[in-house]
Swiss-Prot record:
Cofactor note: Binds 2 heme b groups non-covalently.
Protein name: Cytochrome b
Gene Ontology process terms (BP): mitochondrial electron transport, ubiquinol to cytochrome c
GO MF annotation list: metal ion binding; ubiquinol-cytochrome-c reductase activity
Binding site for heme b b562: 83, 182
Taxonomic classification: Eukaryota, Metazoa, Chordata, Craniata, Vertebrata
Other noteworthy facts: Heme 1 (or BL or b562) is low-potential and absorbs at about 562 nm, and heme 2 (or BH or b566) is high-potential and absorbs at about 566 nm.
């Protein structure tokens, strides 16, 4: 078998990626989230495939087909709740993975980082379209509000929105195409994840110290396969606790009402994992300005390699930058809370301050802190 895995064309690829891969000896549990995201993607594709066998993308029957899955299909309730909560789990792992990349300076690997940002956009698009499919109240109104944002684009906006809708409102054509895109995008995400991994293995992994680790590498198997397996066990324990005991904890009760174009819910909001970006969108009174801020809230990550001023890569020995990083994390939590609140005082001003702080920390405070720390270390 040793000879086989090193010589067979297919086995050789797996061997170089997961078995004989030289890995830094000191990477911590924060490096587990890449493999956990792979597991989340497998769970989502598998559960989604079984749901697609019973789901009908039609405005008249979509809601009842989801009800049918939960009531009549063998273990349909389990598959449905695994898929819905799997999305939440996916985003928890995704945000932790990005946070680790920011903390330890992994954004220095620019190709890997930029493909990661593309993966984030693709995952957000997939999750948004998936939320529309059950055709509940929040599905319908969420789709209407979010797609309508594109009308803020000058000149082509209105035509673009109607083109995406396939008519003059969110209707059967919209649902049909959203289902088609929701089905194909995870496979594109899987392909992009392989490219992400390819570029990562060109440079090798970063480590908590942020220093070159060429002099001290260990084989990926058995050390990190065992470590990843522990992460997988803990993740699945958390996941099935959520699915079996609290399946509706992260959902919206409004989505248990069938979509009604004549009745607007009192408060339209997306799923919890988009609330921070939604709060940034709402904090700007101008429609186009809000859309630009929404896109920039994610795209600002692409600027990180270009605005790095510190001579040290990791934040491990940089106390000022550490403080700012955790301030940013707290700010994202505040934005997530604000995104779920109605648009009224004092939430409006809190949202505006938190949005301003979000961009200021990343674009101004972090680079300035890097320069100060260089001076402190006499670099």
């Amino acid at each position: 078998m040793t000879i086989m895995r090193k010589t067979h064309p297919l086995m050789k690829m797996v061997n170089h990626a997961f078995i004989d891969l030289p890995a830094p000896s000191n990477i911590s549990g924060w490096w587990n989230f890449g493999s956990l995201l792979g597991l989340c993607l497998i769970i989502q594709i598998a559960s989604g495939l079984f749901l697609a066998m019973h789901y009908t993308p039609d405005t008249m029957t979509a809601f009842s087909s989801v009800t049918h899955i939960c009531r009549d299909v063998n273990y349909g309730w389990l598959i449905r709740h695994m898929h819905a909560n799997g999305a939440s789990l996916f985003f928890i792992c995704l945000y932790l993975h990005i946070g680790r990349g920011m903390y330890y300076g992994s954004y220095s690997y620019m190709e890997t980082w930029n493909i990661g940002i593309i993966l984030l956009f693709l995952t957000m698009a997939t999750a948004f379209m998936g939320y529309v499919l059950p055709w509940g109240q929040m599905s319908f109104w969420g789709a209407t509000v979010i797609t309508n944002l594109l009308s803020a684009i000058p000149y082509i906006g209105t035509d673009l929105v109607e083109w995406i809708w396939g008519g003059f409102s969110v209707d059967k054509a919209t649902l049909n195409r959203f289902f088609a895109f929701h089905f194909i995008l995870p496979f594109i995400i899987a392909a992009m994840a392989m490219v992400h991994l390819l570029f990562l293995h060109e440079t090798g992994s970063n480590n908590p110290l942020g220093i070159p680790s060429d002099c001290d590498k260990i084989p990926f198997h058995p050390y990190y396969t065992t470590k990843d397996f522990l992460g997988i066990v803990l993740l699945l324990a958390f996941f099935f606790t959520l699915v079996l005991f609290f399946p509706d904890l992260l959902g919206d009760p409004d989505n248990y009402s069938p979509a009604n174009p004549l009745n607007t819910p009192p408060h339209i909001k997306p799923e919890w994992y988009f609330l921070f970006a939604y709060a940034i969108l709402r904090s700007i009174p101008n429609k186009l300005g809000g859309v630009i801020a929404l896109v920039l809230s994610i795209l600002v990550l692409a600027l990180l390699p270009h605005i790095q001023t510190a001579k040290q890569r990791s934040l491990m020995f940089r106390p000022i930058s550490q403080f700012l990083f955790w301030l940013l994390v707290s700010d994202v939590f505040v934005l997530t809370w604000i995104g779920g609140q109605p648009v009224e005082p004092p939430f409006i001003i809190i949202g505006q301050i938190a949005s301003l702080l979000y961009f200021t920390i990343i674009l101004a405070f972090m680079p300035i802190a890097g320069l100060i720390e260089n001076k402190m270390l006499k670099w």
